[in-house]
Amino acid sequence: VKSARAILRAAFFGVATVVWSGQASISIYDFSSQLNDRFANSSSFVAYAYNLSGIGLDNNGQWLTMISPNVFLSANHFHPSTGASVTFYASNDPNGLSVTRTVTSTAQRIGTSDLWIGTINEPLPNSFVYYDFATQDITSLGQFNSSPYKDAVAFIMGRSPTGWSTSQDMAVGCNKLDRWFDSITVGGTTDDAMGAVYDGPSDPNFVSSEARVESGDSGAGMFVPSAGGKLTLVGINWFQYTAGSETGSGFSYVGNYDGQIQSFLNAYSVPEPSVFGTVAGLVALGWGFSRRLRKSSG
């Protein structure tokens, strides 16, 4: 993998003060609503086989990806604010079952990264999913090259060019994870990052629905399919970059912060409402919630 570090120009995006009309939609090669819009509710949707009910956009257009029934990940530079309202949909049907929650003040930046972790006021019902997240430490190009994520084809979430209502403004593209950035500084944050080059159709790494993040996509999740038809949350959209003639997307890699994420989950995660009655008595006896108690993204 060639290094773009020395010549990288990273474009920090998704500033919270940017108005709705200034937020660009995700770039997807040969975009079509039926193929790429979640709420077109089409069987040809690129992520049709996967459950996206644990992904939400708040009323300000900021992203939440659930990692427990009440805990979410987002981007530090563009995260949901306390009191924001967010709607989650149980399916890709825009008229189907949905629930609305409020973002609480129990939230924090994860270390000095661009990751943000927070909570909603009430757990999602058990008909909604949350996602397992990457846990492998990757701190060098060599470790990335030997990891399961090198050249994996990822699903990249972003805003749609179609013009949906805010809570349904979700499009999905794909890209091959083929870049690693050591200690890149973007918008005042310095961290390692995973990357995906935005290739053209003639490039050998080009994939169908090839995608690149844009300004409205900060804080959305980047997922890699895992065993059993589930999705693993591997990254959170952080930046877009240009290096010579190359452009692409950069993601905060979740796996390097799994310990801090799990500590937050241990402190603040609660089970979905359906299990409150059966475990309430156990809580007083030191019962600890684990994000692995039920399947997470089937």
Predicted regions and their residues:
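Catalytic-histidine neighborhood of serine endopeptidases
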Residues: 68-69, 73-112, 123-125, 150-152
